[in-house]
């Protein structure tokens, strides 16, 4: 137990047995918490709380209700958040997460493929991925295969969800988030491959921007800030 960080919260009487309480228990390896504490401290901040990504995502989805049919109320929605090295596929019913799948896949793979194909450094490949300027064969030889991998991962996750229990409802829409969501046309490709409407998720879409904020940068980075937005919405004592 020395290597485990955990916390719990009593949710209240159980629907199945009112004489007992439902308890939410969250546990992770201590090193996972320590790494995040170190990162926050290195930025000159003081960490006050560590939350679970699935809970943060659920909070953040409230900021994308303008992109959901009926604001997601009594609806089944899917959110896929492509990170650098890992991706989270979640399904929400009535704005509550009912299924989550994490898998190893992300934008880092595209960066590494650019490095291998064009002999660039990690920094050069990352900059070229965002700013462009790659050879004409980039789309066909590098980007299209990566997009194919993205759609396969979404399709596979959808099948896992549908097979995870009886009565699973197919999502009415998929919100595509994370840095990879900025790839031109990727949401349309995912929609055509899986047969479900898809759109780039924008958790900042209804927010007013400060005059000091760079609107173009915010618009570009918004979809990659899903977890950060969810954490920012979290209250604590």
Question: Model-derived features: where do they sit?
Answer:
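Active-site neighborhood for divalent-cation/phosphate handling
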Residues: 1-65, 173, 203-209, 224-227
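A polyampholytic, Gly/Pro-enriched intrinsically disordered region
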Residues: 3, 68-77, 124-128, 216-229
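Gly/Thr-rich phosphate-binding beta-strand-loop-beta motif of the actin/hexokinase/Hsp70
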Residues: 19, 67-99, 109, 114-117, ...
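Glycine-rich phosphate-binding loop plus the immediately following alpha-helix
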Residues: 31-59, 96-136
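Glycine-rich phosphate-binding/hydrolytic loop that grips phosphoryl groups
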Residues: 56-59, 181, 199-237
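Adenine-nucleotide phosphate-binding core of ATP-dependent small-molecule kinases
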Residues: 112, 116-117, 125-173, 180, ...
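Glycine-rich phosphate-binding loops at beta-strand->alpha-helix junctions
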Residues: 146, 169-199, 203-205
